[in-house]
UniProtKB/Swiss-Prot annotation:
Source organism superkingdom: Bacteria
Protein name (record): Peptide chain release factor 1
Keyword Mitochondrion: no
Residues carrying N5-methylglutamine: Q235
Annotated keywords: Cytoplasm, Methylation, Protein biosynthesis
PROSITE patterns linked: RF_PROK_I
Length: 356
C-alpha cells in the first residue's frame, strides 16, 4: 500500500471515529467511548503531521510561483522545501510498523533475585527509578501488592502504570523494555569487608487489557483466597481480611492485591492483573517462534540471564541487548531514562523495518 493510500485510509477512519465520539449513544457507553478515544489518540499525530505537510506543499507551490515575480520568495520556497522533506520523514516514521500494544497501560512485577537482602534493596531501587520516571512523564503508578524484606527492600512488588489520558505512546511503549534480569555490582550495605558483590532483580511487564472481559477467564478455573494484609511494621496495612489471592488453576498463575480497603476492590484489581498475565501468556505462546520482546522476558532469576548491568563503582549502566553504555547511573536511578529508552526504541524500530 502506498503512503498516500495509507494516509487516505487513516483520514477516513479518523473522521469516522470523530463522528462516532460526538454521538450521544456512544458517549453513554463508556467502554466503547474509551476504546474510540484510545484509537483516536493513536491516529491524531498522523493526522496532525499530514495536515502540516499538505499546508507546506500548498505554501511551497505558491512561493515558487511568486518567486518568478519577486526573488525574495525564492528563499521562502527553499525553506518550505526543507520543511516538506522533514515532514515527509516524520510521516513515514509515524506510518512505520509498530507494536500494537504501545498505547496500552501495564502491569509490572519486580522481584528480588539472587543476592538475598542486597537483591531486595536493589529491587526497591528499581521500583523507585520507575516511579520517578513515571511521575516525570505524567503516568500514574499504583502499588497492587508488596512483600518487603527485613531492611525495607522489595522481595516482590506488583505495580499498575497507566496514562492519565489515552495516548499513542502509553506505558507499554517504554516500560516493555524493562522485562528481564537486572544485575547490580556494588558493595552491599550488609558487606563488612568492603567487597564488591553481584546481585540481581527480575522485572516482568505485561500490557493491561482495557477490560477484563476481553480475556476469557472461567470462574471454575479460579481459586480465590482472602487473608489479612501484611506489611513491614504494620504501617498503612488494613486490619480486616480484605487482601485477595487468586490462583488460576490451569496455568498455576497466582496474583494478589491488598492495596484497596475492600475485598471487592482488591478482587477486581487482582482480576485485572490476572487478565494481563493471561493475555501476555497467550500472545507469547502464539509468537513462540518469533523473536518478540515479550517472549524473551525473564524465565529465572539467574544472574547470567541479564539484560542490563548497574555498576556502582564506575557509575555506569550497560544495556546488553543494544550495546548501550553511559556513565550516569546516579541520574538513571533518579528516573532519567529518556536517553536509554530512546536508544531502545530506535533499535526496535530498525528491527521492525528490517523485518518488513
Amino acid at each position: 500500500m502506498s503512503q498516500v493510500s495509507a494516509v487516505d485510509d487513516i483520514v477516513s477512519e479518523y473522521q469516522g471515529i470523530e463522528a462516532q465520539m460526538s454521538d450521544p449513544e456512544t458517549m453513554g457507553d463508556q467502554t466503547l467511548f474509551r476504546k474510540l478515544s484510545k484509537r483516536y489518540s493513536e491516529l491524531q499525530p498522523i493526522i496532525n503531521v499530514n495536515n502540516k505537510l499538505v499546508q507546506a506543499r500548498d505554501d511551497h507551490e505558491a512561493a515558487e510561483e511568486m518567486a518568478y515575480e519577486d526573488k525574495e520568495f525564492a528563499a521562502e520556497a527553499e525553506r518550505l522545501a526543507e520543511e516538506i522533506v522533514s515532514l515527509e520523514e516524520q510521516l513515514a516514521d509515524l506510518l512505520a510498523p509498530r507494536d500494537p500494544h504501545d498505547g496500552d497501560d501495564i502491569v509490572m512485577e519486580v522481584k528480588a533475585g539472587a543476592g538475598g537482602e542486597e537483591a531486595a534493596l536493589f529491587a526497591g531501587e528499581l521500583v523507585r527509578m520507575y516511579q520517578r520516571y513515571a511521575e516525570k512523564h505524567g503516568f500514574t503508578v499504583e502499588v497492587l501488592g508488596l512483600s518487603e524484606s527485613d531492611l525495607g527492600g522489595v522481595k516482590d512488588m506488583t505495580l499498575s502504570i497507566r496514562s492519565k489520558t489515552p495516548s499513542r505512546d502509553g506505558a507499554w511503549s517504554v516500560f516493555k523494555f524493562e522485562g528481564g534480569v537486572h544485575r547490580v555490582q556494588r558493595v552491599p550495605v550488609t558487606e563488612s569487608q568492603g567487597r564488591i558483590q553481584t546481585s540481581a532483580a527480575g522485572v516482568l511487564v505485561y500490557p493491561e487489557p482495557d477490560e477484563v472481559a476481553e480475556v476469557e477467564i472461567d470462574d471454575k478455573d479460579l481459586r480465590v483466597d482472602v487473608y489479612r494484609s501484611s506489611g513491614k511494621g504494620g504501617q498503612g496495612v488494613n486490619t480486616t481480611d480484605s487482601a485477595v489471592r487468586i490462583t488460576h488453576l490451569p496455568t498455576g498463575l497466582v496474583v494478589t492485591c491488598q492495596k484497596e480497603r475492600s475485598q471487592i476492590q482488591n478482587k477486581a484489581r487482582a482480576m485485572q492483573v490476572l487478565a494481563a498475565r493471561l493475555q501476555a501468556m497467550a500472545e507469547e505462546q502464539a509468537e513462540a517462534e518469533a523473536a518478540e520482546g515479550r517472549a524473551a522476558q525473564i524465565r529465572t532469576m539467574d544472574r547470567s540471564e541479564r539484560i542490563r548491568t548497574y555498576n556502582w563503582p564506575e557509575n555506569r549502566i550497560s544495556d546488553h541487548r543494544i550495546g548501550y553504555k553511559a556513565n550516569n547511573l546516579d541520574s538513571v536511578l533518579n528516573g532519567d531514562l529518556d536517553d536509554l529508552f530512546s536508544a531502545l526504541q530506535a533499535a526496535e524500530r530498525a528491527e521492525r523495518l528490517e523485518a518488513e
